[in-house]
Design a protein with these regions (language model features):
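Active-site/ligand-binding surface loops and adjacent short beta/alpha elements
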Residues: 1-28, 33
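Active-site pocket scaffolds in enzymes
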Residues: 20-124
């Protein structure tokens, strides 16, 4: 499992994507880093099986104790609910995939200017 710190716009918007250039396809997951500050990526590359998971989340895979020690455990009171916003998009046009890469590059450049560096978005 990889834990990413995605670069985000001023409003918290960010995305992760998986691109298959051979097939000319991309899957984009857009979300708010304010609502879901963690992004986990996991892979299974066993023979005959290739799976990748992109999981925006409000806590990491480190567990409750880790977040309690850090003071950032996400609490949800009894009977409460929350709404999170995610958008999934499939791209199948070369120009759309190129635009996605430009969007990634712009977001990373902006984040580096603001905070002096940013982790890679999950996109080659």
């Amino acid at each position: 499992v990889y834990i990413h710190a995605p670069a985000a716009a001023d409003d918290g918007s960010t995305f992760a994507a998986v691109v298959n250039d051979e097939l000319g396809l991309a899957l984009v997951v857009e979300f708010s880093a304010r609502e879901l500050p963690y992004l986990m990526e996991w892979k299974s590359m066993a023979s005959g099986d290739y799976v990748v998971g992109l999981e925006p989340a409000n806590s990491s895979v480190h567990g409750r104790g880790y977040h309690e020690q850090r003071g950032d455990l996400h609490h949800l009171p009894a009977q409460a609910s929350e709404t999170k916003h995610l958008r999934f998009t499939v791209l199948n046009a070369p120009e759309d995939i190129s635009a996605l890469r430009r969007r990634r590059d712009d977001l990373l450049a902006s984040a580096r200017r603001v905070r002096g560096g940013a982790d890679r978005l999950a996109l080659p």
